[in-house]
Amino acid sequence: GTSVITALTAQNTKGVHGIYPATADFVPAHLHAVIDDFALKAVKTGMLFNAEIVETIVSVMESKEIPLIVDPVMIAKGGASLLKEQATIALKEKLLPVATVCTPNIPEAEVLTGLTIKTEEEIKFAGEYLLNLGMQCVVIKGGHLAGKHAIDTVFIRGEKPFKMKTERLKTIHTHGTGCTFSAAITAEIAKGKPLKTAIIEAKSLFN
């Protein structure tokens, strides 16, 4: 795989100490450099931080027939905001409609839908709401809900929603499990796996 830098962070397992976004002209230059050199099979976005960067990604990717996986990174584990308010609006209105898969956790899904999500019925409503923005698939990660297990709910257009359950990992020493999960989905899609298979196999890394 390869990457395009959208922002730099000064952080550790305790929190984020600084965020330094890439310039608006650097991101498309870097993205085009990667696209021109590699036959990309899938692309994942992570922390985009501001609206300019979101709109840059949209302007490039909307003309490409490359599966786009959006991990809507908004809030760091320690509580720091990783996506500005205008960027959140741009992500919802412009990036998600051109995405293939979106992988919000519960707080991110609440921001994107404007709903309070505490029950299975509310998760179902949120998933359907997000699918209606134009994506093929939404994975709502349930790790923020109470319970012994972390339960993710998968919505694929035209199919019945299903759940994936794993033992909850309790640790203060690591973060980034959501990013790892979305990266694994991207890798499986890049291998040519169907959406459902790609998501299930990506989740198996956490069992």
Locations of regions flagged by a protein language model:
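Active-site-adjacent loop and "lid" segments of alpha/beta metabolic enzymes
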Residues: S3, N12-F26, G78-E85, L91, ...
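Conserved phosphate/ATP/ADP-binding segment of small-molecule kinases
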Residues: E85-P161
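Short pre-catalytic strand/loop immediately N-terminal to key active-site residues, enriched for Gly-Thr
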Residues: K160-H175
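Nucleotide and nucleotide-moiety/phosphate-recognizing core
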Residues: E52, S59-E62, E159-P161, L195-T197
